[in-house]
UniProtKB/Swiss-Prot annotation:
Any one GO BP annotation for this protein: cytosolic ribosome assembly
InterPro entries per UniProt: eIF6
Organism: Nanoarchaeum equitans (strain Kin4-M)
Name used for this protein in its record: Translation initiation factor 6
Pfam families on file: eIF-6
Gene assigned in the entry: eif6
Highest classification ranks of the organism: Archaea, Nanobdellota, Candidatus Nanoarchaeia, Nanoarchaeales, Nanoarchaeaceae
Gene3D superfamilies: L-arginine/glycine Amidinotransferase, Chain A
An example Gene Ontology molecular-function term: ribosome binding
Amino acid sequence: MRVNKIKIYGSDSIGLFGYIANDIAVLSEVISKEEEKIIKDTLGLEGIVKTTIAGTPTVGSFIIGKKDLIIVPSSIYEEELKKLEELFRVEVVDVVNNALGNNYYYWPKKNLLFAAEDTKKEAKLLAKKLNADLYLIDTDIEVGSSLIGNSKMLLHNPDIYIDIEDAKPVTLNMGDKFVGAAALLNDKGIVVGSKTTGIELIELQDLF
């Protein structure tokens, strides 16, 4: 598995600036050509659309989904929606927790949507749209920012308990527990924030 470290827009929380659906991706417009090349080469991406969502650069904060469908909040602008539709089938939802990517995480391997108990009502709606099973977690931590996975593994915040064999607790960015916000991941590689330590990288490579 290919591994790279970068900083985006001066931030090591690089997962906030992209959404990866295995070989296609949504990336923030603030990502430079050099950063985009590193992400594309490391993850082996075949298609990329660059945009904002709701006028903000943190596109990863607003998207959940899978390769054939992504879900975005109703705060998205029309021109942004049109860009996404160049690569994805898109569904727009009117929800309270419009930072979908921060609050929810869909894991294709097990067809599970992870959500906090207190977001159960909205999570049920989203799980239905994804045709996924719902996995509720008793936590007040942002679930989407705390999880990231591929076909082998679900990496998660050590402060969240997940009773799944392939779920492994890790940190990135020098102890950052919000691993979903700290990385971009697919089956071919992982790009992490530049603060990620050598020990954290070794632990990652051992898992994969």
